[in-house]
Amino acid sequence: MMDADIFEQFIDQLGRYVRERLIPAEKEILETDKIPDAIVNEMRDLGLFGLTIPEEFGGAGMNITQYVRTIRTLSYAMPCYRSMISINIGMVCSAFKNGGTEAQKAEWLPRLAAGDIASFGLTEPGSGSDSAAMQTSAVKSGNGWVLNGTKRYITNAPYA
């Protein structure tokens, strides 16, 4: 858990950032359908991609209550900011934290905490968001992977 005093300072700083930087950028995002790279880099610098990642892996080590308050503060701006962060944390980092091997955690959690952006491709045309009915496959082939299938609504796909 992040120290309570440090957390309150962080929330104050984040609130100012939302009001002074994120909300004013919304018009540009609506026009371009993209969060400006400068803002993504600022979000990295603020540590927003590693909120719940343990400190030993470079994250902030927030507990769930702190994370919810952080997301609530961030949510005063349009949802694209929160979505980018929560996919990284809620879908990808959580999978590594809760089900990854120690080697996977050591490789991926520091990168994700530093702001490497992950994507999560769940939704498919025939199965919606039913993970048990997914048809897409990934097969290791030589030095890479062969992906077969169709996805929709892939949050963070342009960044990952």
Task: Identify the function of each model-found stretch.
Residues 1-20, 140-141:
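Flavin-dependent oxidoreductase catalytic core characteristic
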Residues 23-160:
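Glycine-rich flavin
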